[in-house]
Amino acid sequence: MNTTDSSLLADIREVNLSYLLLAQRMLRQDHAASMFRLGFSTEVADILMRLSPAQLVKLASSSSVLCRFRFDDYGLLSALTQDVLGGALQQAHATILLAKQPVEEIA
C-alpha cells in the first residue's frame, strides 16, 4: 500500500471515529431528535449507544466511510442549494424534505 492510500485510510478512520463519537453524544443528549437528524432507526441507535470505546475504534477502522450523504437525489440537492427561500425557511424546507426520506437500517 502506498503513502497516499495509507493517508486516505487514516483520514477515513478519523472521519468515521468523529462521526461515531458525535452520533453517540447526540443520542445521549436527545435520543429522538438525534435519531431523526442522523436518519437512524431505533435498532441502529440502540446498537450505537451500546458500543464501547474499543468497539467504536474497531468500527471506525473500516476502509469505508460510515456516514452517508443524505442528499443523493439531484432534485432535492438542487432545491436546497438555491437561495430562494432565505435562512430559517430554507432550513425548515430541508428538514421537511429529509423527514420524507426512509430511515436506513443495517442489513
Swiss-Prot record:
Signal peptide: none
Entries under Pfam families matching the protein: FlhD (PF05247)
UniProt keyword annotations, A-Z: Activator, Bacterial flagellum biogenesis, Cytoplasm, Disulfide bond, DNA-binding, Transcription, Transcription regulation
GO molecular function: DNA binding
Single Gene Ontology BP annotation: bacterial-type flagellum assembly
GO cellular component, one term: cytoplasm
Localization per Swiss-Prot or TrEMBL: Cytoplasm
Entry comment, domain topic: The C-terminal region contains a putative helix-turn-helix (HTH) motif, suggesting that this region may bind DNA.
Family to which this protein belongs: Belongs to the FlhD family.
Annotated function: Functions in complex with FlhC as a master transcriptional regulator that regulates transcription of several flagellar and non-flagellar operons by binding to their promoter region. Activates expression of class 2 flagellar genes, including fliA, which is a flagellum-specific sigma factor that turns on the class 3 genes. Also regulates genes whose products function in a variety of physiological pathways.
Subunit structure, interactors included: Homodimer; disulfide-linked. Forms a heterohexamer composed of two FlhC and four FlhD subunits. Each FlhC binds a FlhD dimer, forming a heterotrimer, and a hexamer assembles by dimerization of two heterotrimers.
This protein's name: Flagellar transcriptional regulator FlhD
Native source organism of the sequence: Bordetella avium (strain 197N)
